[in-house]
Amino acid sequence: ALPISAQAEQILTWTDGAPNRGTRVEATIWLGDQLAERTDGALKIDYHWGGALMNFKAATKGIGSGAADMGLMVGAYNPTLHPGYLLADLPMPYSDPWVGNRAIYDLVQNNADLQAEFHKLNLQYITNITTTQIELICKDKTVKSLEDIKGLKVRGTGVYMKVFGDLGSTPVNMSSAEAYQGISTGLLDCTQIYGYAIPAFKLEEVANEVTKLDWGALMGMAFVMNKDVYDALPEDQKKTLNQLGSDFIDHYAEKIMAGNAKAYENIAAGKDGNKVNISDLPDAEKAKLVEASAPYIDEWRAAAKASGLDADGIYDQYIALLKKYDDERKAKGYPWR
């Protein structure tokens, strides 16, 4: 065998629907830097941002068919392809980003049904990302209880928007990028959002009340690799990639949680001249939010069972993993501290 330094370098094309900016993108580039470093330059990633190769909807089949070697796959764009994995997008009683992302990573790596779901698409699951907890930012409206949501025009995502609708809000369908204009023109009272995304979309310029719901997160977003490309890698490179996928969970959580903390610090202090009040939804109200999500968990179970998955087994394993990592966090703190 040739010494490692003499192995031909392999360039892996990466498709990403998102523009090249922000914490998640920085962490994605870290993954590529680490892969090159840990394989002594044998594996390198060539990134294509902003949907330049293919958009988010096309990425799942595109990576599976070899139009790209790797990339970010967002489950919500193709729900029928990922009935099991979409459990990751549902509200859970645990909202810590490290806990959630570590649990879903472990679940996919160790659950035969979920492995098969990815393999059927000719994809190898590498690692996972999370939006972090869903919070609420409003203009001139303070939300102290779920009662206060009634009648408010709110933009949201997936099941989280549906639950708000069930609780009496008026759901408004628009993207998070349109929320700024929606709030400034009065089409919206509030938008569901993640901490780091508030300054990213400059929402503190048009809204002044944040209620921390700390409610679930969207985690049905995976870094995947074409399975044929993965299978053709030498064993040592597979091992390196698998270890890196696990290390990424910690690295990403550390960076994204720091991004959230900094965003809140800046908007609370009015760093850019726009001060925002930040309050927490009381625990009893948070519990009601989780309760209101139950019908959608049942809906997920039915869809997963219909596609031949052991839905109860997947769900129970996921809850057990969430509890395991939450207990670990409480006992030992985060791995990077």
Annotate each language-model stretch with its function.
Residues 108-112:
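Core domains of carbohydrate- and sulfate-ester-processing enzymes
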Residues 8-101, 113-337:
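N-terminal secretory/targeting leader peptides
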